[in-house]
Amino acid sequence: TGEKPFSCSTCGKCFLDRSHLTRHQRIHTREKPFSCSVCKKCFLDQSSLTRHQLIHTADKNFSCLECEKCFSKQSSLVSHQRTHTGEKPFSCSECDKCFAFSSELIVHQRTHTGEKPFSCSECEKCFSKQSSLTRHQMIH
């Protein structure tokens, strides 16, 4: 039916099931309880950690013809190749600015929406990018 009965008390976004809501809420709390035993990088959920761990264990059968960098997934190679080609397939519907990576578009769109999902635990100041919060936290 498309009903999404589980809603986030912080931002109001709704979800089909409780597990998706729980994962989403970690965005607001910055909780990343799943840690890579190799490099210590942390993740919101087990599936993201499992996917990440491939970079440490999987065969890297996909290599870039430009720089010979190797990847375990073809999608990672395709994404990397944009650094050489300059291709920017992700465009903003508000201003038509284009980006090479979907993550860059998501961050950019916050300039239009005003969304600031990263908040300082010391002073409550909010930021649109994690890197801006990290830089800010150095003043405390």
From Swiss-Prot:
<keyword id="KW-0862">Zinc</keyword>
<protein>
    <recommendedName>
        <fullName>Gastrula zinc finger protein XlCGF71.1</fullName>
    </recommendedName>
</protein>
<feature type="zinc finger region" description="C2H2-type 3">
    <location>
        <begin position="62"/>
        <end position="84"/>
    </location>
</feature>
<dbReference type="GO" id="GO:0008270">
    <property type="term" value="F:zinc ion binding"/>
</dbReference>
<dbReference type="GO" id="GO:0005634">
    <property type="term" value="C:nucleus"/>
</dbReference>
<keyword id="KW-0804">Transcription</keyword>
<dbReference type="GO" id="GO:0000978">
    <property type="term" value="F:RNA polymerase II cis-regulatory region sequence-specific DNA binding"/>
</dbReference>
<keyword id="KW-0677">Repeat</keyword>
<keyword id="KW-0238">DNA-binding</keyword>
<feature type="zinc finger region" description="C2H2-type 4">
    <location>
        <begin position="90"/>
        <end position="112"/>
    </location>
</feature>
<dbReference type="Pfam" id="PF00096">
    <property type="entry name" value="zf-C2H2"/>
</dbReference>
<keyword id="KW-0539">Nucleus</keyword>
<comment type="function">
    <text>May be involved in transcriptional regulation.</text>
</comment>
<feature type="zinc finger region" description="C2H2-type 5">
    <location>
        <begin position="118"/>
        <end position="140"/>
    </location>
</feature>
<feature type="zinc finger region" description="C2H2-type 1">
    <location>
        <begin position="6"/>
        <end position="28"/>
    </location>
</feature>
<comment type="similarity">
    <text>Belongs to the krueppel C2H2-type zinc-finger protein family.</text>
</comment>
<feature type="zinc finger region" description="C2H2-type 2">
    <location>
        <begin position="34"/>
        <end position="56"/>
    </location>
</feature>
<dbReference type="GO" id="GO:0000981">
    <property type="term" value="F:DNA-binding transcription factor activity, RNA polymerase II-specific"/>
</dbReference>
<dbReference type="GO" id="GO:0006357">
    <property type="term" value="P:regulation of transcription by RNA polymerase II"/>
</dbReference>
<keyword id="KW-0479">Metal-binding</keyword>
<dbReference type="InterPro" id="IPR036236">
    <property type="entry name" value="Znf_C2H2_sf"/>
</dbReference>
<keyword id="KW-0863">Zinc-finger</keyword>
<keyword id="KW-0805">Transcription regulation</keyword>
<dbReference type="InterPro" id="IPR013087">
    <property type="entry name" value="Znf_C2H2_type"/>
</dbReference>
<dbReference type="GO" id="GO:0003700">
    <property type="term" value="F:DNA-binding transcription factor activity"/>
</dbReference>
